[in-house]
């Protein structure tokens, strides 16, 4: 791949880790049949030829397989992680060694993070991306916020907020001083973004409602083969992996409090119960609360659960669901972690500023806070994604579902001219993604007869369910 002289080649922790990363990528490919089938299907066609793709998504081994799929399909790709702790350094090195510009390492500062995001949006010679693969919406946010600043530079004078906002505005200010029309030019060339996660999708819909969205978006998260698999089954395995790698704690016999019972919360609650924990769920939604109760979980408020829990897991995508006051009341040695996209589900900044607690780093991504009354808690991954900060995220097979959707979305956006809106992939593609993964796990599908298909009013080859079906 040719790298523009004006664009940085890569920045990773240690390029010498590339060989190790390549060995793990080879293993992951065998567990990612969807992506490998896409490569085979489009071999020689190069449906993404000419596309400049900026990726802001956890730089893991599984993501490496996605990146190489996009490259195989003809795309010019630049990549950064969407979380300061989620990069697997050997994966980043392996991809950088192939010539794909990667800007990611585990343990970035917030300033590093937004610098890396800036790099993936610069393809050299004044060019930005045509397409974005986003996870959490930060790459999209940088373009849209930069665009707004160019329309109203006074926004730079009012930049404050938390540390993350200050880091973002620092980059945007530097870009504005270099080129006061940069983001207008980038937005003009954009064909669209495909968004991976619930939080990012919420951002897209909010931008659309406010009239701020500048280019089309495909909501990959709400594809059934993403949300009902990655969010549910992926979290069911990777949550426990993160907690155990971080703490070596015995989960059996503990009380686990899972805040939120959406798809992610469901996976987490079932994970903790499968290890022998007694699980308490908190919810705002009466439907989700009823589901949790019907599964046998106790459902109550955080104010009541806070004094019982030994392990607290936030899954809501909302802010301030675990407050400083909650942490003051938790039992001694409680473990606090988050598996939602951002760190604001837990009040980490107020905790760090609180004079009545002493912080002690135990090891990377494990911090002990001792309060003035003598009790302590353990905060994992500084309140960021525990499964990626303290472990390696979801297994390859379930990520193949998600990333096959991402690849199809990128092709869809590149090949077609969508109006500015938020879209979902059609049901037929959702079913095709599932179909591509069946042989790997020995599944044999029953085939409808023509008469049976006519009787229930569906095509013999699908799709079999209406768009509103909830699986």
UniProtKB/Swiss-Prot annotation:
Localization, UniProt: Cytoplasm
GO cellular component terms given for this protein: cytosol
Residues reported to bind NAD(+): 197-199, 231, 260-265, 283, 318, 339-341, 387
Free-text remark on how the cofactor is bound: Binds 1 NAD(+) per subunit.
Transmembrane segments: none
EC class: hydrolase
Positions with a binding annotation for substrate: 60, 135, 196, 226, 230
Homology family: Belongs to the adenosylhomocysteinase family.
CDD domains found in the cross-reference section: SAHH (cd00401)
Keywords assigned: Cytoplasm, Hydrolase, NAD, One-carbon metabolism
Protein name: Adenosylhomocysteinase
An example Gene Ontology biological process: one-carbon metabolic process
Pathway membership: Amino-acid biosynthesis; L-homocysteine biosynthesis; L-homocysteine from S-adenosyl-L-homocysteine: step 1/1
């Amino acid at each position: 791949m040719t790298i523009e002289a004006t664009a940085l080649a890569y920045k990773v922790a240690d390029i010498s880790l590339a060989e190790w990363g390549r060995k793990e990528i080879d293993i992951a490919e065998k567990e990612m049949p969807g992506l490998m089938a896409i490569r085979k299907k489009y071999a020689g066609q190069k449906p993404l030829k000419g596309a400049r793709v900026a990726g802001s998504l956890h730089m893991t081994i599984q993501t490496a397989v996605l990146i190489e799929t996009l490259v195989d399909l003809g795309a010019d790709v630049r990549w950064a992680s969407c979380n300061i702790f989620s990069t697997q350094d050997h994966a980043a090195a392996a991809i950088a060694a192939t010539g794909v510009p990667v800007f990611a390492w585990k343990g970035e500062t917030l300033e590093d993070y937004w610098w890396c995001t800036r790099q993936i949006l610069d393809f050299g010679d004044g060019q930005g991306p045509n397409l974005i693969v986003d996870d959490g919406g930060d790459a999209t946010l940088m373009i849209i916020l930069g665009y707004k600043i160019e329309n109203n530079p006074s926004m730079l004078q009012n930049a404050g907020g938390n540390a993350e906002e200050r880091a973002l505005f620092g980059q945007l200010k530097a870009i504005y001083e270099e080129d006061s029309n940069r983001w207008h030019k980038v937005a003009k060339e954009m064909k669209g973004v495909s968004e991976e996660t619930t939080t990012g999708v919420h951002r897209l819909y909010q931008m659309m409602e406010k009239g701020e969205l500048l280019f089309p978006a495909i909501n990959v998260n709400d594809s059934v083969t993403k949300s009902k698999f990655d969010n549910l089954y992926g979290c069911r395995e990777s949550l426990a992996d993160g907690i155990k790698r971080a703490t070596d704690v015995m989960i059996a016999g503990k009380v686990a409090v899972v805040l939120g019972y959406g798809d992610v919360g469901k996976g987490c609650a079932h994970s903790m119960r499968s290890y022998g924990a007694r699980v308490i769920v908190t919810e705002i939604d009466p439907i989700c609360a009823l589901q949790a109760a019907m599964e046998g979980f106790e459902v109550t408020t955080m104010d009541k659960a806070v004094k019982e829990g030994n392990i607290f897991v936030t899954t809501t995508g909302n802010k301030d669901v675990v407050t400083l006051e909650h942490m003051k009341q938790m039992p001694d040695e409680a473990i606090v972690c988050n598996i939602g996209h951002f760190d604001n589900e837990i009040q980490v900044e107020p905790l760090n500023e609180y004079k009545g607690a002493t912080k002690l780093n135990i090891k990377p991504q494990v911090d002990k806070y001792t309060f003035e009354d003598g009790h302590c808690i353990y905060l994992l991954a500084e309140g960021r994604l525990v499964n990626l900060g303290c472990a390696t995220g979801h297994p390859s097979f379930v990520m193949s579902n998600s990333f096959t959707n991402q690849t199809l979305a990128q092709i869809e956006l590149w090949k077609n001219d969508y109006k500015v809106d938020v879209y979902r992939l059609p049901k037929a593609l959702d079913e095709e993604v599932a179909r591509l993964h069946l042989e790997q796990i020995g599944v044999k599908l029953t085939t409808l007869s023509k008469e049976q298909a006519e009787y229930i009013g569906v095509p013999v080859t699908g799709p079999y369910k209406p768009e509103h079906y909830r699986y």
